[in-house]
């Protein structure tokens, strides 16, 4: 079973990510993205969806026109895990 990150691990891992913030009321991280238009936002979401399916680890997300908000947490573990960090790292790599 996958284990939640400790507070120290979470702080260390979060420091290595670009633009991700801890969610105040839960053990999760979140980032907002803004694109030129809906097509660009949807293309980004498609790339994330393909990777998430490969990882069998799916984000919570919200999209309005050119904005996408993603929240990552591992429900089975009850909080942030290495899976979330790996998906966030992938997301960072396609938005750099």
Swiss-Prot record:
Keywords: Lyase. One of its GO terms (biological process) is tetrahydrobiopterin biosynthetic process. Its EC number is 4.2.1.96. It holds the Pfam family Pterin_4a. The keyword Lyase applies. Belongs to the pterin-4-alpha-carbinolamine dehydratase family. InterPro entries: PCD_sf, Pterin_deHydtase. It comes from Paraburkholderia phytofirmans (strain DSM 17436 / LMG 22146 / PsJN). One of its GO terms (molecular function) is 4-alpha-hydroxytetrahydrobiopterin dehydratase activity. The keyword Lyase applies. This is Putative pterin-4-alpha-carbinolamine dehydratase. Gene3D superfamilies: Transcriptional coactivator/pterin dehydratase. It catalyses: (4aS,6R)-4a-hydroxy-L-erythro-5,6,7,8-tetrahydrobiopterin = (6R)-L-erythro-6,7-dihydrobiopterin + H2O.
């Amino acid at each position: 079973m996958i284990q939640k990150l400790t507070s120290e691990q979470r702080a260390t891992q979060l420091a290595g990510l670009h633009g991700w913030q801890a969610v105040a009321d839960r053990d999760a991280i979140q980032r907002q993205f803004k694109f030129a238009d809906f097509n660009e936002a949807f293309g980004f979401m498609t790339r994330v969806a393909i990777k998430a399916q490969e990882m069998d680890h799916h984000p919570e997300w919200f999209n309005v026109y050119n904005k996408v908000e993603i929240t990552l947490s591992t429900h089975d573990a009850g909080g942030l895990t290495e899976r979330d960090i790996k998906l966030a790292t992938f997301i960072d790599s396609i938005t750099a």
